[in-house]
Amino acid sequence: MAAPLIQLNNIHLRFSAEPVLEGINLTIHQSEIVTIIGPNGAGKSSLVKVITGLIAPTTGSITHCAQGKQPLRIGYMPQTLHLDPSMPIKVSRFLSLAGPKAPSRSARKAALEQVGIANLSSAQMHNLSGGEFQRVLLARAILQRPNLLVLDEPLQGVDVNGQIELYRLIAELRQQLQCAIVMVSHDLHLVMAQTDSVVCLNRHMCCHGQPESVSKHPEYLKLFGKQASDDLAVYTHNHDHHHDMHGDVVGCSDECDHHHD
């Protein structure tokens, strides 16, 4: 197995008296793709913010594993980004504002080329389609050539065909950058086929495992075809408990398979 990049040890997070994350233990390795899934309010975005250091856990520890003499470099793509429509800004200018030190023109150009939108450098951010906007955010995340790329619901506002294209692009970025990828998905069952590990989250880690190939599911193949099945996969949950309407754990006397509403 590849060397670890980051380790989360018994992470708990509370906002006021409200538990958000409970007992999270997770190790992310070099060049690994980890997809985090779970219902709304499960703590997915909070977990990626803990991973990126945007918020500190209430208790527990995070270990960054140095890569030779280089510190861990994290690229982050947020779930949402709202721009003031009264303030026009071009794509290239938007990218120049990334990080404490403005990236060079050549770095911005290279990032846009890597995500396939070099032609949009002079476009206004407000005129972009949903898929184009997501690619700009992705370009921003890779400007510093991270060895850990964290993507919080990167497929928002993108149709199914656009999702497949983005999944292919993400796989290419892993190969080009040799980086690990942590990706949040709002879909409980459909994940990127190249995913090495799936974490099902509902405040705590409900289950953790490998996705099953979507090619085994004839109904999906009928809808989207074999080509789509190469880029998407289905994850089957295997829980020994369920959650009540408040998100609290309720145990099962026997092993139970279920879904979150």
UniProtKB/Swiss-Prot annotation:
Its EC number is 7.2.2.20. GO terms for biological process: response to zinc ion. GO terms for molecular function: ABC-type zinc transporter activity; ATP binding; ATP hydrolysis activity. InterPro entries: AAA+_ATPase, ABC_transporter-like_ATP-bd, ABC_transporter-like_CS, Metal_Ion_Import_ABC, P-loop_NTPase. This is Zinc import ATP-binding protein ZnuC. Belongs to the ABC transporter superfamily. Zinc importer (TC 3.A.1.15.5) family. It is found in: Cell inner membrane. Keywords: ATP-binding, Cell inner membrane, Cell membrane, Ion transport, Membrane, Nucleotide-binding, Translocase, Transport, Zinc, Zinc transport. Part of the ABC transporter complex ZnuABC involved in zinc import. Responsible for energy coupling to the transport system. ATP binds at G38, P39, N40, G41, A42, G43, K44, S45. It is a peripheral membrane protein. The complex is composed of two ATP-binding proteins (ZnuC), two transmembrane proteins (ZnuB) and a solute-binding protein (ZnuA). PROSITE patterns: ABC_TRANSPORTER_1, ABC_TRANSPORTER_2, ZNUC. It catalyses: Zn(2+)(out) + ATP(in) + H2O(in) = Zn(2+)(in) + ADP(in) + phosphate(in) + H(+)(in). It comes from the Bacteria. Gene3D superfamilies: P-loop containing nucleotide triphosphate hydrolases. It is an enzyme of class 7 (translocase). The keyword Lyase does not apply. One of its GO terms (cellular component) is plasma membrane. Residues 6-227 form the ABC transporter domain.
